[in-house]
């Protein structure tokens, strides 16, 4: 009798994706982050669902409802902090996952890569709207500043911003719609993640060498299921250390002050995972220019396949490209640091130099390095 997992219509899908999936035998721990992102997404949906049972999306009661969750709901505090810090873990995994894709040339799977970029945008939108919901000072002012960047769009900008706000300022209508979108988007992300996986399984996984591994595959289970479980345990360990010992480490103290439209916080800044993009936005004195740079700083990922000049797929055997890649990582860390600093000397000039460096590295130096490596190998 043939195994049910190979015949049942639903079990067959699971089997082909997680059990009998032919996988390269040499994929490293950098390939763990896909499954970790799946775990993060499930965790965020579950904790978010329980938070939504007690949260009220009204400007008068939103802040109090979050306080109520932490003080009066059984284990509400742990659910709230798992959700808040779970977002940070989500973005750490996301950045690692994208970085892995850049380093090992996984962007040559065009469909998978482009869906991934859409997923990144959707996740960033979800996280931004989630940050608005507790309705603290940074929530309200962050929403005001970030939605206001749309007013840079010529002719329709102001109307567009007021349409998104549902009035002439960030108020009850804005909070209610942000809650609605924050609730629905993770389910859209789940659907997109399935499409992402579908396209990946059309081609099979890449591997550190960048060479086709069709001649040598091993089943996903048990080899990579056990490896993913180890990754998941380490992820949960890191998350729980954060939640139980330093739950507010990555948050902003200003968000413990209820939103007050009459009092502007001294430094308006988003959560740490948006600081690199925020630094690029602030580095350009022109409003529209800053907004375009902000959007393009993420959208540049779509251009990666077109900017690939090397005849080798992976950076594993390309030392010049490796140097440029790690300089890019250092540059992004610099931008993240600058995004959290006040707009004053010397931070302004450092931010501007780091922003120029970011685009220069990706658009000019990486393609040049690929060509130099080709020539040095007489290819």
Curated annotation (Swiss-Prot):
Heme 1 (or BL or b562) is low-potential and absorbs at about 562 nm, and heme 2 (or BH or b566) is high-potential and absorbs at about 566 nm. GO terms for biological process: mitochondrial electron transport, ubiquinol to cytochrome c. The chain crosses the membrane at residues 33-53, 77-98, 113-133, 178-198, 226-246, 288-308, 320-340, 347-367. Keywords: Electron transport, Heme, Iron, Membrane, Metal-binding, Mitochondrion, Mitochondrion inner membrane, Respiratory chain, Transmembrane, Transmembrane helix, Transport, Ubiquinone. The cytochrome bc1 complex contains 11 subunits: 3 respiratory subunits (MT-CYB, CYC1 and UQCRFS1), 2 core proteins (UQCRC1 and UQCRC2) and 6 low-molecular weight proteins (UQCRH/QCR6, UQCRB/QCR7, UQCRQ/QCR8, UQCR10/QCR9, UQCR11/QCR10 and a cleavage product of UQCRFS1). This cytochrome bc1 complex then forms a dimer. It is found in: Mitochondrion inner membrane. InterPro entries: Cyt_b/b6_C, Cyt_b/b6_C_sf, Cyt_b/b6_N, Cytb/b6-like_sf, Cytochrome_b, Cytochrome_b_C_euk/bac, Cytochrome_b_N_euk/bac, Di-haem_cyt_TM. It is a multi-pass membrane protein. Its cofactor is heme b. Binds 2 heme b groups non-covalently. A ubiquinone binds at residue 201. GO terms for cellular component: mitochondrial inner membrane; respiratory chain complex III. It comes from Hippotragus niger (Sable antelope). This is Cytochrome b. SUPFAM superfamilies: a domain/subunit of cytochrome bc1 complex (Ubiquinol-cytochrome c reductase), Transmembrane di-heme cytochromes. One of its GO terms (molecular function) is ubiquinol-cytochrome-c reductase activity. Component of the ubiquinol-cytochrome c reductase complex (complex III or cytochrome b-c1 complex) that is part of the mitochondrial respiratory chain. The b-c1 complex mediates electron transfer from ubiquinol to cytochrome c. Contributes to the generation of a proton gradient across the mitochondrial membrane that is then used for ATP synthesis.
């Amino acid at each position: 009798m043939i195994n049910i997992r190979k015949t049942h219509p639903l079990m067959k899908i699971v089997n082909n994706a997680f059990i009998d999936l032919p996988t390269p035998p040499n994929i490293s721990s950098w390939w763990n982050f896909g499954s970790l992102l799946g775990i993060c997404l499930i965790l965020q949906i579950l904790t978010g669902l329980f938070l939504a049972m007690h949260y009220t999306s009204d400007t008068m009661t939103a802040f109090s409802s979050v306080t109520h969750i932490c003080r009066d709901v059984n284990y509400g505090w742990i659910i709230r902090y798992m959700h808040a810090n779970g977002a940070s873990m989500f973005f750490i995994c996301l950045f690692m996952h994208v970085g892995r894709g850049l380093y090992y040339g996984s962007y040559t799977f065009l469909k998978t890569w482009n869906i991934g970029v859409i997923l990144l945008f959707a996740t960033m939108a979800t996280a931004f709207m989630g940050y608005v919901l507790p309705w603290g000072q940074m929530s309200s002012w962050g929403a005001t500043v970030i939605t206001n960047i749309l007013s840079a769009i010529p002719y329709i900008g102001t109307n567009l911003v007021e349409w998104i706000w549902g009035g002439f300022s960030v108020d009850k209508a804005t909070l209610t719609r942000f809650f609605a979108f924050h609730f629905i988007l993770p389910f859209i992300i789940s659907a997109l993640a399935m499409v992402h996986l579908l396209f990946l399984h059309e081609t099979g996984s890449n591997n550190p060498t960048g060479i086709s591994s069709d001649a040598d595959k091993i089943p996903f289970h048990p080899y990579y299921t056990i490896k993913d479980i180890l990754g998941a345990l380490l992820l949960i360990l890191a998350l729980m250390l954060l939640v139980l010992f330093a739950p507010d480490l990555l948050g902003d103290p200003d968000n413990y002050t209820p939103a007050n439209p009459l009092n502007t916080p001294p430094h308006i800044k988003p959560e740490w995972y948006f600081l690199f993009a925020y630094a690029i936005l602030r580095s350009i004195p022109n409003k529209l220019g800053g907004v375009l740079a902000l959007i393009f700083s993420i959208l540049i990922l779509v251009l990666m396949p077109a900017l690939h000049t090397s005849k080798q797929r992976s950076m594993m055997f390309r030392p010049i490209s490796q140097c440029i890649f790690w300089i890019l990582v250092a540059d992004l860390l610099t931008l993240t640091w600058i995004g959290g600093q006040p707009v004053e000397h010397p931070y302004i000039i450092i931010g501007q130099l780091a922003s120029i460096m970011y685009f220069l590295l990706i658009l000019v130096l990486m393609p040049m390095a690929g060509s130099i490596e080709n020539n040095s190998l007489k290819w």
